[in-house]
Amino acid sequence: MNANPKFLSADAHVDAAAVAPLPNSRKVYVTGSQPDIRVPMREITQADTPTGFGGEKNPPIYVYDTSGPYTDPDAKIDIRAGLPALRQGWIEARGDTEVLDGLSSQYGLERAADPATADLRFPGLHRNPRRAQPGKNVTQMHYARQGIITPEMEYIAIRENQRRAEYIESLKSSGPNGAKLAAMMGRQHPGQAFGAAAFGANALAEITPEFVRDEIARGRAIIPANINHPESEPMIIGRNFLVKINANIGNSAVTSSIGEEVDKMTWAIRWGGDTVMDLSTGKHIHETREWIIRNSPVPIGTVPIYQALEKVNGKAEDLTWEIFRDTLIEQAEQGVDYFTIHAGVRLQYVPLTANRMTGIVSRGGSIMAKWCLAHHKESFLYEHFEEICEIMKAYDVSFSLGDGLRPGSIYDANDEAQLGELKTLGELTQIAWKHDVQVMIEGPGHVPMQLIKENMDLQLDWCKEAPFYTLGPLTTDIAPGYDHITSGIGAAMIGWFGTAMLCYVTPKEHLGLPNKDDVKEGIITYKLAAHAADLAKGHPGAQVRDNALSKARFEFRWEDQFNIGLDPDKAREFHDETLPKDSAKVAHFCSMCGPHFCSMKITQDVREFAAQQGVSETEALKKGMEVKAVEFVKTGAEIYHRQ
């Protein structure tokens, strides 16, 4: 047996809270053109409108679901075995890959043979790694440029549409007022898309498989989907699709274990993490990553230079191209879907950071800057970029070109070092695209609000619309402990301007490693930012969920308000702090205004009065005002009265 029984029983589990379905929700699957294209969504059941408000049916709404099999009661979850290989059949059917006899990374072979790591290795089903056949290119971009719509692309189109058309049809058939209800619930404000696809206010605009293929072929979107991570559910990152969010996890030299990191991953995807980056820098990086990938239904990203540095005992100057290359192959054969590679940190840019307030704050950037200065040579990442592309396209690993010179304070925002690196990333993007390798560009950082759009505009210009992936940006530096908020502001703005994926920031940013509660707080904050950006862009159907919650709020359907929201648990908890009884869940008021001052209750009273008098709501309001005016004069025409 190659796994310690104590580890398996004590740590290798999924927290029960991470696998329970969310309240009034169930996992549903939408089948595509072939039986094995089964796209997961979360169906949220709603109560009927109370009789006093019309008594109409409220059909379920459907929302994007990143939780994988974990919230499916029918799934058998055993993280010691890993998840089912969802894409295995699609990969094999293309006939352009080969299964290797074993690992081809020297370090991977050493770890597999090391008895000291036997107790920590993933014990589940082991597949030999897969690689492109000689002369073949297995990237989704390559297929797209050949005019091929892959099952992954069809899966994504279904997923992005979130059954909007079916929801509108169910509204139309809900009763005599169905057509009116469908028009109301499907309405959304026109967006301002800043050059992205102009969907207008059309909630029913459909994302087609052909649209997905075209965006991938143009380089405006990526599908991170390593052929060695068949467990992943296909997703897309691009500004003409729903804004995505990434959650960072990972151990350090001083804290965390494999079990904790798997737990954080499942927790992050429960609350909406579209991808997860494993930024481990402590012990057992290789083993930790294997456990995470085998159990992850979302793409996994890494920063390979972190592990390469561990291999040279933390001495940046001892890094070599050969060590880094072996690390890329090691991680690609495990199934990492995208690599952050800081190839834009060039020797000529390092002196430009000398006058900064906060210097170089990127770990990867500082590692490469130190190497360049120690050898007074150009970065080996930049020099060997074409060779890196050859590795990427053999496994379909996507580039996340790292912003190693991003500003670490608003003082340093948009300076010469940051923008010089961005130009280089644009040049590297063109090289990667020659190889049909998928690329996204990482962005800042710390940027005040008035400079955010300039960042987005320059990235679109210099990087030819490759997807932008930003950390925030943080819009002020005065709030340690609240940087999920300072960055959420910037994230919403830059998402609106065109960023495709937002890297979450937790309350622990700059202070320490996040725990599970911090992960959830960061995820929810960034789901809000991403959704606000979708609304502002006018993305098809973005307002459906808002409309459903607003209707539930107006009709005092408290449980539906909780359940449609991003965090039903917190909403219910806050409500119950002041109105804990079950009777309060059907009351026509909350603790904010009480029973006599609820604006929505007053509106309902006006409507009832209008119906009783046989007049319009406007006439009812006018009559009510006339009655109150007479009453005011009779009581002395004084604004205030002593009781």
UniProtKB/Swiss-Prot annotation:
User: What residues bind [4Fe-4S] cluster, as annotated?
Assistant: 590, 593, 598
This protein's UniProt keywords: 4Fe-4S, Iron, Iron-sulfur, Lyase, Metal-binding, S-adenosyl-L-methionine, Thiamine biosynthesis, Zinc
Q: Is Metal-binding one of the keywords UniProt gives this record? A: yes
Pathway the protein takes part in: Cofactor biosynthesis; thiamine diphosphate biosynthesis
Task: Name the catalysed reactions.
Answer: 5-amino-1-(5-phospho-beta-D-ribosyl)imidazole + S-adenosyl-L-methionine = 4-amino-2-methyl-5-(phosphooxymethyl)pyrimidine + CO + 5'-deoxyadenosine + formate + L-methionine + 3 H(+)
Molecular function per GO = 4 iron, 4 sulfur cluster binding; carbon-carbon lyase activity; zinc ion binding
- List cofactor names only: [4Fe-4S] cluster
**Which domain of life does the protein's organism represent?**
Bacteria
Q: What class of enzyme is it?
A: lyase
| InterPro entries, per database record | ThiC, ThiC-associated_dom, ThiC/Bza_core_dom, ThiC/BzaA/B
* E.C. no: 4.1.99.17
Q: Where does Zn(2+) bind?
A: 446, 510
TM spans (from-to): none
Any one GO biological process: thiamine biosynthetic process
Carries keyword Cytoplasm?
no
Q: Name one GO cellular component term.
A: cytosol
Q: Where does substrate bind?
A: 248, 277, 306, 342, 362-364, 403-406, 442, 469
Q: What Pfam families does the record tag this protein with?
A: ThiC-associated, ThiC_Rad_SAM
- HAMAP family to which the protein is assigned, alphabetical: ThiC
Its family remark reads: Belongs to the ThiC family.
Function comment = Catalyzes the synthesis of the hydroxymethylpyrimidine phosphate (HMP-P) moiety of thiamine from aminoimidazole ribotide (AIR) in a radical S-adenosyl-L-methionine (SAM)-dependent reaction.
Subunit field text: Homodimer.
Q: What is this protein called?
A: Phosphomethylpyrimidine synthase
Species in which this protein is naturally found: Burkholderia ambifaria (strain ATCC BAA-244 / DSM 16087 / CCUG 44356 / LMG 19182 / AMMD) (Burkholderia cepacia (strain AMMD))
